[in-house]
Amino acid sequence: NGFNNHRAIQSLMVITGRFDRPGTALPDYETYCHSNGGFASLEEEFVDQVRPKTDKKGVGRERFPLWADMVDEAQGMDLANQILSGKPYPLKAGVLLGVNTRMYPDTRRFVRALDQLDFILADDIFWTEACRHADLVLPASTSFERSEVKCYAGKFINYTKPVIPPVHDNRDDARIICELASALDLDDPLLRSGYDKCLQYIMSPGGIQDWDAFRAHDGPIPVPNARPYVPGTYLKEGPRTPTGKLELYSEAVAKYRDRGLDPLPVYADSDDRADPEEYPFVFCTGARLSNAVHTRVHKCSWPRALRQDASVD
């Protein structure tokens, strides 16, 4: 219902004309890592140029086809099923970068699935359950020990700086991936060249002339080629929908009506057939805590103060 609630709100904006006009909801475009920097990067090209040419579908595509149509990612919620069943094809190894086993449904079953893999490489900043089930564990850098490129909606870009030197022999995820690509001699020269060169390529449409000066600069800088969005552009170019219109009845969802999905954003009652008078409470295992991110920061004093007592949600 969260998905349909979002769709309903968007539909009301369309019906009342409060979309893609000055002072209304405006479409959002992604520059890098789901952030809008006001310019089109080469992030998709960076991936597509070396995308494996295979007929193997991503994990979860058959079970979650709408997700697969909308998001260029596998669906991890189906990972354990594929490992255990070997269908539609077997999985033999896993690279677990900061994987939190508690995020997955039926955690014990997920861990059992991991144990069936022939090899697991894991990295993390803590000795987690995933690390305990790995064959090789690499220490990862915290955000305090590494740099990264970030872009912002204000048309700025920033090359962050580490605030402390690396503690012991840890490395950040991107460096681990790039160095593994070199060690395995993958056919991807750009990836083998390292994180900095990759980001220089991805962000090149932004028009930054002196990348070294940008990397050395303390704080964000304006992106030369970034431009503010002009209201009305999206509607003028035509919505990227099957009908080319703003759809209240989603044709993309309609393809999967046999999966129980409704093209209209309607409320779906619980599948539980219990009598609400006799059983007035609903047990929810997916509730979000405002003071934590999954299993993170539970032991930090200031967010813990927002929720001092343990409870059952």
What are these regions, as identified by a protein language model?
Residues 1-85:
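Acidic catalytic cores of enzymes that act on phosphate-bearing nucleotides/polynucleotides
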Residues 6, 10, 174-178, 281:
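Non-catalytic, well-ordered alpha-helical scaffold segments
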Residues 10-14, 139, 178, 182:
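Generic alpha-helical structural context detector
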Residues 16-23, 134, 141, 184-188:
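A generic secondary-structure signal for well-formed alpha-helical elements
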Residues 22-28, 122, 139, 192:
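A structural signal for short, well-ordered beta-strand segments and their strand-loop junctions
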Residues 25-36, 193-207:
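A glycine-rich phosphate-binding loop feature that marks nucleotide/adenosyl-phosphate handling sites
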